[in-house]
Amino acid sequence: MDNGIFIVATIFIVNILYVTIYTVRLLLTMKGYRYLAALSSVFEMIIYVVALSLVLDNLNNIANVLAYAIGFGVGIIVGMKIEERIALGYITVNVITKEYNLDLPNQIRDLGYGVTSWLASGRDGERMMLEILTQRKNERKLYKHIIEIDNGAFIVSSEPKQIHGGFWVKQVRK
């Protein structure tokens, strides 16, 4: 294999690894996983120094710089895909039902979710408001269940910053 192609491929692959670890580490930091984030930063910096030195030692070839830049972009996508699969943390799902249905919260509770519900008033009449806390990895499954039960439901999710008490108090890891 030609040495130039080998260097370009190495720069590309090493930078994908670096940025993937960087992206996952950043997300771990934001989720509060301090020690895991710190450990991953050690590997991140080792890979970064290797990738950067390869580029700086071979600046005479524009393909090396392009491989570095493209590897950076691909690494962000790969890192985000990995984080989506890991799905760390919890989400709060707010549901506004199409119609007032007293049985809906119990149907969702029967699926293993903690649900708080109350009467809400919408433009077209009474609705039921539900608040559900679940692990992010269960988000799509929860959406599917809600839509099966109430296809016209309005669903919004957000990521809680802190959790204290309630249904999840014994299960939530700090």
From Swiss-Prot:
| Record flagged with keyword ATP-binding | no
Instruction: Enumerate the transmembrane spans.
Output: 4-24, 36-56, 62-82
Q: How does it sit in the membrane?
A: Multi-pass membrane protein
Signal peptide boundaries:
none
Annotated InterPro entries: DUF2179 (IPR019264), DUF5698 (IPR044035), UPF0316 (IPR022930)
Q: Which UniProt keywords apply?
A: Cell membrane, Membrane, Transmembrane, Transmembrane helix
Gene Ontology, cellular component aspect? plasma membrane
**Cell compartment(s), UniProt:** Cell membrane
Q: State the NCBIfam families in the record.
A: PRK04164.1-3, PRK04164.1-5
UniProt similarity note: Belongs to the UPF0316 family.
Record's protein name: UPF0316 protein Lm4b_01790
